[in-house]
């Protein structure tokens, strides 16, 4: 099994899932991707890095959170082939000994998925805002790591300087 994040949380790097799938096919391996930092806003319809890289049918297990972009307070999901999910339900100790999600979180999460299926307006707006922010920060002279992800690393290269920036942002209510 090859396991990767779809998008990496520290810098927004998007995994080359198409190449990972090719590697998995060469070695007859499964592919699992954690979409916690991609579900809802990466890919044309927000289905994450598998959609973004054009490999939806080639990823065997997808995990994600109902928090972050999807707005839930807790919980997550694992999706995959029926046989894999049945095995995980039987053998995953954390699953066996955990509590179920509150019905309100499940209901709200279902509505978010429905909303994302019906329109890309919010996702498109986030993409536009991210592009604007990246361009504006670059124009202002900041070193921005290239990418399309809404996680936008601003490279300051010195911890004391980063602390000063953080303090100033807090002072301004940001």
Can you say where each PLM-predicted feature lies in the sequence?
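Short, small-residue-enriched loops and turns at beta-alpha junctions
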Residues: 6-11, 38-41, 95-96, 154
């Amino acid at each position: 099994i090859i396991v990767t994040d779809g998008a990496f949380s520290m810098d927004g790097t998007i995994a080359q899932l198409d190449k990972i799938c090719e590697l998995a096919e060469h070695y007859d391996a499964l592919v699992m991707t954690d979409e916690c930092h991609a579900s809802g806003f990466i890919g044309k319809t927000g289905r994450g890095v598998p959609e973004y890289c054009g490999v939806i049918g080639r990823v065997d297990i997808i995990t994600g959170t109902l928090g972050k972009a999807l707005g839930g307070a807790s919980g997550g999901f694992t999706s995959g082939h029926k046989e894999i999910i049945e095995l995980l339900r039987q053998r995953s100790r954390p699953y066996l000994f955990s509590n179920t999600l509150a019905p309100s979180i499940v209901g709200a999460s279902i509505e978010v998925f429905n909303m994302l299926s019906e329109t890309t307006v919010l996702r498109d707006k986030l993409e536009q805002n991210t592009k604007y922010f990246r361009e504006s920060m670059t124009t202002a002279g900041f070193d921005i790591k290239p990418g399309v992800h809404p996680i936008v690393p601003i490279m300051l290269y010195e911890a004391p300087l980063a602390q000063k920036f953080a303090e100033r942002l807090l002072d301004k209510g940001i």
